[in-house]
Curated annotation (Swiss-Prot):
It comes from the Bacteria. Involved in transcription antitermination. Required for transcription of ribosomal RNA (rRNA) genes. Binds specifically to the boxA antiterminator sequence of the ribosomal RNA (rrn) operons. PANTHER family: ANTITERMINATION NUSB DOMAIN-CONTAINING PROTEIN, N UTILIZATION SUBSTANCE PROTEIN B-RELATED. The keyword Transcription applies. Residues 148-176 are annotated as: Disordered. GO terms for biological process: DNA-templated transcription termination; transcription antitermination. One of its GO terms (molecular function) is RNA binding. Keywords: RNA-binding, Transcription, Transcription antitermination, Transcription regulation. Coiled coil: none annotated. This is Transcription antitermination protein NusB. Residues 161-176 have a biased composition (Acidic residues). It comes from Corynebacterium aurimucosum (strain ATCC 700975 / DSM 44827 / CIP 107346 / CN-1). Belongs to the NusB family. One of its GO terms (cellular component) is cytosol.
Length: 176
């Protein structure tokens, strides 16, 4: 069964910026080069219309530079929520790039709602990866969001309470 051709016109400018950022992060990892240098090269190439290189959106630049700067924290967050059978290095490079874009938005871009970062990441996975990637990426991103929400000072008090005190309280109640 073949997939229908995606309708790129229905996607927002931000979605297209995320897609381009994932492309650049993927390329940078594949070529072992700095992703910010790729952006700078593309900006220069886009100045001459004869090169056929599309201009780089400001949001693409923001994502790529932010993800490059925070790569260790982003990769740690992703690795923390991978299933025990998987390591970050074992995840397909395209899936890593997509998750890096989404996790950067979740952890470091307060202007993007977490739900938007998650949905757009899953949409990118559906577009670029295999059928199993989208649900897996959804689960990892959801775990990152849940952990970030629990650590947030804006989170409800119940989300900040660890599980042990509740278990201790039940045990203490049983001894009376």
């Amino acid at each position: 069964m073949t997939r229908p051709e995606p309708n790129f016109k229905r996607h927002t400018a931000r979605y297209r910026a995320r897609r381009r950022a994932a492309d650049i992060l993927f390329e940078a990892e594949s070529r072992d080069v700095d992703p910010v240098a790729i952006v700078e090269d593309r900006v220069e190439l886009a100045r001459d219309p004869e090169n056929g290189v599309a201009p780089i959106a400001d949001y693409t630049r923001e994502i790529v530079s932010g993800a490059a700067e925070e790569l260790d924290a982003i990769d740690d967050a992703i690795a923390r929520y991978l299933s025990s059978e998987w390591s970050l290095e074992r995840i397909p490079a395209v899936d890593r790039a997509i998750m890096r874009v989404s996790v950067w938005e979740i952890l470091f871009n307060a202007d993007v709602p977490n739900a938007t970062a998650l949905v757009e990441g899953v949409e990118l996975a559906s577009e670029y990866s295999n059928d199993k990637a989208a649900p897996y990426i959804h689960a990892v991103l959801d775990d990152v969001i849940q952990a970030q929400s629990a650590d947030s000072p804006m989170a409800p008090a119940s989300a900040e309470e660890p599980a042990e005190p509740a278990e201790t309280a039940e045990t203490e109640g049983d001894t009376k």
